[in-house]
Amino acid sequence: MKKTFYLIVFLIAGTLGNLSAQMTLFKGTFDEAMKKAQQEKKDLFVDFYADWCGPCKVMASEVFTLPEVGDFFNSHFVCIQINVEAANNKEIAKKYNVTALPTMVFISHDGKELRRVQGAVPPDALIKEAKIATGEELSFEQLYDKYKKKKNDFDVQQQLLLEAPMFIMTQDGYNRQKWGARIDGLFPEYLKNKKIERMTNCADFLILTMYHRTTSKDDPIFDYIAKNFDKFAQGVAKDVEGDGKLEVARYLISMNNSYIIQLCKKGDINYKKRLARVNGDLKEAYAGISFGSLSVYDAITLLADATYSLYRHDENAFFDKMDAYFIGKGDSTALNDYTQPLQDLAVVYEGNMSENAYRKCTNWIAKALTFDMPADTRTRLLMMMGDCLKNTGEPAKAKQSYNQAFIVSAEIENKMMMQQLQQAIQESLQGL
């Protein structure tokens, strides 16, 4: 009996401990919350929400409940949720110009707005906004003013570049353009003055992945990282959990593959020279990738040759290369291996393929549908299957595929997307 009692007490204590760690929400009116904030010499954090608002629910259930959020907010703010649709809250929502949900406003105990956040944000971003509101951290604008006074301070420049994307996303119209132009000019300046040789650390590597996302024939940044792969990997690994080599390899591979495909689509035969780097100075970066029985070089060569052939409208060569790729990759073939070439075919031929191409696509789609995938992806694949069957003289099977697509579309969470796809399906059915 004692053991049972202690177990129950332990479980209750654990539950209460979890609850106390999350954000404490004041139960009462806005005016009562303001009075409490004045008494406790705290500021006010107001979460304006509505019952129908999905992002509001995400913030309430996945962010406000986190211990790190609760610890900071409970010690610095009186926190309250205000339902904007309640009649007694209309005036307060109007006063603080709530035009989108969720809107979270930091308010001083004398009623002055300190800062606001619109839309769902991750916990670290919300805590940062709270620290800016309390004056513990600089706002982005204040940080930029600091940079203008100390233009040789690499730490300030680094922080600006890291914070810029999130900040710019919150801006509209002219302000977004203004700040975008300022940051676009800051990155080359930072790179020129600090030098790539001194950027072998996690923060600077992140900046490179944010602002240098494409490569070209002459790219000293790409070439330096490729030449100093181990040095960069070690520098990144010091500051992050996980494998620094993997992070640097992904960066190089993504840019190199994209450039190869870009050359293929343009019909530039120099893609073969770029392919040679896969077995050359980029060999270590590509070492962790598996393509079934194919070597990395052979697999990427098949995909590149297939893309080159497709954009030259050499249909037979395209399918031959892709079939060889699928055979070589075998059981490790993934969903994207099918969906990407299907998408490329749709772009190049704009729905006007040969009967042989439609039959080939039917086979690929059937294999793709065996994988797990989101409802919108499955809906689109079933619609494509219907199109292929329609163009190979099988209207009954096409109708069946369109109907199946309509049923699956009901599972799509994004209602606007669901309605658009359902309308397209109905038009396809009418066209049979």
What are these regions (language model features)?
Residues 1-25:
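Bacterial Sec-dependent N-terminal signal peptides
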Residues 22-40:
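N-terminal leader/targeting and pre-domain segments
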Residues 23-28, 48, 62-89, 98, ...:
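Thiol-based oxidoreductase modules, predominantly thioredoxin-like and allied folds used
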Residues 40-54:
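Short active-site neighborhood of thiol/selenol oxidoreductases, capturing the structured segment around
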Residues 40-44, 75-78, 101, 108-112:
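Loop/turn elements at helix/coil->beta-strand transitions in domains of secreted/extracellular proteins
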Residues 57-61:
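Detector for the c-type heme attachment site
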Residues 99-139:
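Non-catalytic, surface beta->alpha helical segment in thiol-disulfide oxidoreductase systems
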Residues 151-432:
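Oxidative protein folding and maturation machinery
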